[in-house]
Curated annotation (Swiss-Prot):
SUPFAM superfamilies: Prokaryotic ribosomal protein L17
The entry's keywords: Ribonucleoprotein, Ribosomal protein
Keyword Isomerase attributed: no
Gene3D superfamilies, sorted: Ribosomal protein L17
InterPro entries found in the cross-reference section: Ribosomal_bL17 (IPR000456), Ribosomal_bL17_CS (IPR047859), Ribosomal_bL17_sf (IPR036373)
Name of the protein in question: Large ribosomal subunit protein bL17
One BP annotation, GO: translation
Gene Ontology cellular component terms for the protein in this record: cytosolic large ribosomal subunit
Gene that encodes the chain: rplQ
Annotated transmembrane regions: none
NCBIfam families referenced in this protein's UniProt entry, alphabetically: L17
GO MF annotation, one: structural constituent of ribosome
The organism of origin for this protein: Aquifex aeolicus (strain VF5)
Protein family (similarity comment): Belongs to the bacterial ribosomal protein bL17 family.
């Protein structure tokens, strides 16, 4: 039973949702700032923050765990070597979501920018 279980499904199967999260995470890691819908940004935040926690550990085991969640070696390498050292003194809140004053033209979806906190 699914009583009181809340998760955004985005009208996708589990595999499609995971592919969406991985694609958004990859884009955020390489571009460091992306524009997407508010709901996708919130879902991405809950996907990417545990990856940053693993990257801060920096161990081989943590790297392998991160690769199992985001199977993209260049992205994991950048996450562990470039992004994680920025957050050594921070205990969470690695990304910032900024709501944009306009909506998407096609369907009126509320848009946001998600970026790393510096």
């Amino acid at each position: 039973m699914r009583h009181r279980v809340k998760k955004k499904h985005f009208d996708r199967t589990k595999e499609q949702r995971l592919a969406l999260y991985r694609s958004l995470a990859r884009a955020l890691i390489f571009d460091e700032r992306i524009e997407t819908t508010v709901e996708r940004a919130k879902a991405l935040r809950s996907f990417i923050e545990p990856l940053v926690e693993l990257a801060k550990e920096g161990t081989l085991h943590a790297r392998r765990q991160a690769l199992s969640r985001l199977p993209d070696k260049p992205a994991i390498k950048k996450l562990f070597e470039d992004i994680a050292p920025r957050f050594e003194g921070r205990n969470g809140g690695y990304v910032r979501i900024i709501k944009l004053p306009y909506r998407r033209r096609g369907d009126g979806a509320e848009m946001a920018i998600i970026e790393w906190v510096e």
